[in-house]
Design a protein with these regions (language model features):
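PRPP-dependent phosphoribosyltransferase catalytic core
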Residues: 3, 9, 132-175
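Short glycine-rich phosphate-binding loop at a beta-alpha junction
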Residues: 52-60
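Conserved G/P- and acidic residue-centered "switch" motifs that form tight phosphate/ATP-binding loops
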Residues: 123, 128
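Solvent-exposed alpha-helices and their adjacent loops that cap or buttress functional pockets
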Residues: 50, 97, 109-113, 141, ...
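Active-site-facing substrate-recognition patch
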Residues: 1-53, 103
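Short Gly/Thr/Asp-enriched flexible loops that form oxyanion-binding sites at enzyme active sites
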Residues: 65-74, 135
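Short, glycine/charge-rich flexible loops or terminal/linker lids adjacent to PRPP-binding catalytic cores
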Residues: 76-118
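Conserved acidic residues
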Residues: 54, 116, 146
């Protein structure tokens, strides 16, 4: 079975979560299957090597679950992008619009040296707002974003449109 088929077989649809009309893509069955999760992490570590990443960035919260073990497998460091107010010390912040309101991501000001080749990981590419904010924040910090990887792309939400010219890796694309 292909890695995409394996991931697809371990994703559970939860209808009407977190609100009516939304079908939530639950990755916990994938995480609970050590073999499938391990193969997924190996795939992600190989992708990190292919894009020439020097550092891996995970987006809170489920991006941490993927990025940290993939970084370790690839022999790279890991940097978390957090929700506001979760990191002590001096931080950089990038705000972005949501359908109804605003959100933001933060990172430690000194987490990344200028010119470092970074790869970003998260579980789902939906509207692209969070991923675009992450890339913008990292570039403002001086990093070179070499790629963004997602387990699942929700193609109907057109997140790719907010990431023009970016190297994207999506294991599973659903409509």
């Amino acid at each position: 079975m292909s890695i995409a088929g394996l991931v697809a077989s371990r994703i559970r649809d939860i209808p009407d979560f977190p609100q009516p009309g939304v079908v939530f893509k639950d990755i916990t069955p994938l995480l609970a299957d050590a073999g499938a999760f391990g193969q997924t992490i190996e795939y992600l570590a190989d992708w990190l090597d292919r894009v020439g990443a020097e550092l891996v960035v995970g987006i809170e919260a489920r991006g941490f679950i993927l990025a940290a073990p993939a970084a370790l497998q690839a022999g790279l460091g890991f940097v978390p992008l957090r929700k506001p107010g979760k990191l002590p010390g001096v931080t950089l912040r990038e705000s972005y619009a949501l359908e109804y309101g605003e959100a933001a991501l933060e990172m430690h000001e000194d987490a990344i040296r200028a010119g470092t080749r970074v790869a970003v990981m998260d579980d789902v590419l939906a509207t692209g707002g969070t991923a675009a904010a992450a890339a913008d924040l990292l570039e403002r910090a001086g990093a070179q974003v070499v790629g963004l990887s997602f387990l699942i792309e929700l193609a109907a939400l057109k997140g790719r449109a907010k990431l023009p010219g970016r190297d994207l890796d999506c294991l599973l694309t659903v409509l």
